[in-house]
Swiss-Prot record:
Its job: Catalyzes amidations at positions B, D, E, and G on adenosylcobyrinic A,C-diamide. NH(2) groups are provided by glutamine, and one molecule of ATP is hydrogenolyzed for each amidation.
Gene this chain is encoded by: cobQ
Protein known as: Probable cobyric acid synthase
Organismal lineage: Archaea, Methanobacteriati, Methanobacteriota, Methanomada group, Methanococci
Coiled-coil zones: none
GO annotation, biological process: cobalamin biosynthetic process
Membrane-spanning segments: none
Lineage: superkingdom: Archaea
Keyword Nucleus among record annotations: no
Signal sequence, start to end: none
Pathway membership, UniProt: Cofactor biosynthesis; adenosylcobalamin biosynthesis
Length: 492
């Protein structure tokens, strides 16, 4: 049987995801078989499990931290917002139905049974299960129907840790208010408090620690210092609010990413950040980079409509005429074609719309969703290299362009053994693919960046450091947690 530990928060972005990742890596480093778990997650950032099911990217990342093969049981319920208060409900990796909140709430008991199935599976197959809660664990207007927080600790028998972000201010009020608003049966599950993102001298918190323990009879088990050097994947698009420039700010190569209104899987661009200056651009902005990325999106037709309304379509065409490099991923790839056909308005209110026309390609929506871990080979001029990625798309594309990838596994454009498209227009290179994670393949990533290096007479790069950087940061996070938290009463 597994030992269950749960991390809940006083608010969203309190540090739950990071703390779970760090505990998973710490336990893995000690030789335990560890699984992360989040019963219900809401995110447009998702990846594909070993069963070819869809799970939130946060649980996929936590699985990597735990050195575990990502499973649908790590995130049995995934909600993907579609707009108008409706979300696509993913159950055990497979699209279940589209529901608004009231409809979803009516299915609570059915979904809770699915969650229990996953808890039973994890209990039988792992030494430790580290559970992440969602948002605040004490939204009193939602407690009756909450299947993502302390109800899960109660079901699994988990010891719970409450984490709060001191960087926001009011940390002790947040902790006290949360504890006092919780029902007694859930309050007693809390075994300790964690203060996250502290800067300064710990001595100034001593009186606060003593008072909060006196008031709640629950100890503060640690304080995690704010560490700006940690490089960790972001969980969802909230992280992009106010984020514009990141990556290697000294790099002579600039990458622009169009900030789609319903951007999805934006972490696809992260592998470029060690070598390039990265910049999100809005629909009204000019394109100033050497490489332009059209990322994934939940609604390709909506983004195409917005690009036209704001003149971004014309800016992209001018960028191509001037020799720019374009990479479209999934929804971004679809916008590069001649037409996006959505007769049933499955993508939103726009319906069928003409695309950028950079590829001789048409995409049709309303199909069964392709959810695949995929592999194949890229052959560009005299270059040949194997790549892997994952597919999450309902659009099927028929392209008359040169395929980017010959598939050995996957669905690709329309189940025809090929994925993506590739085209050279003058000095401009246009790439498109359904492969999320394409830039995690160092040979393709280096090929893309070296096109710019060659144009600018810069030194070529031959880096293969993305996975290494991830593991270094996870080990650093693990050490930070082990040095600053007393988990001895919880981890036995």
């Amino acid at each position: 049987m597994a030992k269950f530990i749960m991390v809940v928060g006083t608010s969203s972005n309190s540090g739950k995801t990071v703390l779970v990742s760090g505990i998973c890596r710490m336990l893995s480093n000690k030789g335990y078989k560890v699984a992360p778990f989040k019963s219900q997650n809401m995110s447009l950032n998702s990846r594909v499990s070993i069963e070819d099911g869809e799970i939130a990217v946060a649980q996929y990342t936590q699985a990597m931290a735990a050195r575990a093969e990502p499973s649908i049981h790590f995130n049995p319920i995934l909600l993907k917002p579609k707009g108008n208060f409706v979300s696509q409900v993913i159950v055990h990796g497979i699209p279940y139905e589209d529901r608004d909140y009231n409809e979803y709430r009516s299915k609570k008991d059915v979904l809770l049974e699915k969650i229990k199935e996953s808890i039973e599976y994890l209990d039988k197959n792992y030494d430790y299960v580290v559970i992440e809660g969602a948002g605040s664990c004490c939204e009193i207007n939602l407690l009756k129907d909450d299947i993502a927080n302390l109800r899960i600790a109660e079901i699994s028998g988990a010891d719970a840790i409450l984490v709060s972000d001191i960087d926001r201010g009011g940390v002790f009020a947040a902790i006290y208010g949360t504890v006092k608003l919780l029902p007694e049966n859930w309050r007693k599950l809390l075994k300790g408090f964690v203060i996250n993102k502290f800067r300064g001298n710990l001595d100034v918190l001593k009186d606060g620690f003593e008072k909060i323990e006196e008031l709640t009879n629950i100890p503060v088990i640690g304080t995690i210092p704010y560490d700006e050097t940690l490089i960790l994947p972001e969980e969802d698009s909230q992280a992009l609010e106010g984020k514009r420039v990141f990556g290697n700010v000294k790099s002579p190569i600039e990458v622009n990413i169009v900030k789609f209104s319903k951007i999805a899987n934006f972490t696809d661009v992260d592998p470029l950040s060690s070598d390039c200056l990265m910049k999100y651009i809005d629909f009204n902005d000019d394109i100033t980079g050497d490489i332009l990325i059209l990322p994934g999106t939940r609604c390709s037709t909506v983004e195409m409509d917005l690009m036209k309304k704001h003149g971004m379509d014309k800016k992209i065409m001018e960028f191509v005429e001037n020799g720019g490099i374009v990479l479209g991923i999934c929804g971004g790839y679809q916008t590069l074609g001649k037409i996006l056909i959505d007769e049933n308005f499955s993508e939103g209110d726009v319906g069928t719309i003409s695309g950028l026309g950079l590829f001789d390609m048409e995409t049709t929506f309303g199909n069964k969703k392709a959810i695949k871990n995929s592999t194949g080979t890229i052959s560009i001029f005299d270059q040949n290299f194997d790549v892997m990625g994952y597919e999450l798309h309902e659009g099927h594309s028929i392209s008359n362009e040169t395929p980017l990838i010959s598939l050995s596994r996957g669905f690709g454009n329309c189940g025809d053994s090929y994925d993506g498209s590739f085209k050279v227009i003058g000095d401009s290179y246009i790439f498109g693919t359904y492969f999320h994670g394409i830039l995690e393949n160092f040979e393709f990533r280096n090929y893309l960046v070296n096109i710019v290096n060659n144009k600018k007479n810069l030194s070529r790069i031959e880096n293969d450091n993305y996975a290494e950087i991830f593991n270094e940061n996870m080990d650093k996070l693990s050490k930070l947690i082990e040095e600053n938290l007393d988990l001895s009463k919880i981890i036995k």
